[in-house]
């Protein structure tokens, strides 16, 4: 754990975002609470990750922006050696307590990914950074740091929201104001990231894209993957070249 951060790392933290998630920390593991959509989408995200890693058992995994540990615990249940990092200490306290109650061995750290990547470059078989990029001022720096922490030949996953009229209507108007799936103010549409923009960031980090799928809501099936519809939520799998 570190107690100090560089000026560049401090600039890549939005205090309002940290405060927002800290205030909701106690409700991370309530499947019917403010994080209900993440509980619903988590199995789909996990399946996508497992499919593109040939399983997680025995792999060293870094979960960036782990929050209360929903994905971290799910990956640990699959036999992964998980390190979860986040800058919302209240969320990490909840994650640690839940892991203890569940009997899961997960290394949760309150540390910036930029710092961790400097300390442990090329150390992880798999890196995940899901629903986090749209909450930071400089997502490109996060992508670069995640890639730095990944071993050559390792797999890396990002998920976020596309930026267009449809994502504004569904991701903000409907989800926050009409259906109440997530608290009002959870997202800022201007911070949503188009797939083409994310791919430019991953290209700059020397990552090779493998697959991109949309995460869409089906009234009958719940959240499902789509190879064609990336208009709102989407997830991307990439690989770090061997050399």
Swiss-Prot record:
Which GO terms are recorded in the biological process aspect for this UniProt protein? methylation
Please list the reactions this protein catalyses: a 3-demethylubiquinol + S-adenosyl-L-methionine = a ubiquinol + S-adenosyl-L-homocysteine + H(+); a 3-(all-trans-polyprenyl)benzene-1,2-diol + S-adenosyl-L-methionine = a 2-methoxy-6-(all-trans-polyprenyl)phenol + S-adenosyl-L-homocysteine + H(+)
The record, for SUPFAM superfamilies, names: S-adenosyl-L-methionine-dependent methyltransferases
What InterPro entries does the record tag this protein with?
Methyltransf_11, SAM-dependent_MTases_sf, UbiG_MeTrfase
Q: Which GO terms describe its molecular function?
A: 2-polyprenyl-6-hydroxyphenol methylase activity; 3-demethylubiquinol 3-O-methyltransferase activity; polyprenyldihydroxybenzoate methyltransferase activity
**Where is S-adenosyl-L-methionine bound in this sequence?**
45, 65, 86, 130
Q: Does the keyword S-adenosyl-L-methionine apply?
A: yes
State its Enzyme Commission number(s). Answer: 2.1.1.222, 2.1.1.64
Enzyme class name: transferase
**Which pathway does the protein contribute to?**
Cofactor biosynthesis; ubiquinone biosynthesis
The yes or no answer to whether the keyword S-adenosyl-L-methionine is present is yes
Q: Which UniProt keywords apply?
A: Methyltransferase, S-adenosyl-L-methionine, Transferase, Ubiquinone biosynthesis
In terms of CDD domains, this protein maps to: AdoMet_MTases
Protein family per UniProt = Belongs to the methyltransferase superfamily. UbiG/COQ3 family.
Role of this protein? O-methyltransferase that catalyzes the 2 O-methylation steps in the ubiquinone biosynthetic pathway.
This chain's protein is named Ubiquinone biosynthesis O-methyltransferase
Encoding gene, per UniProt annotation: ubiG
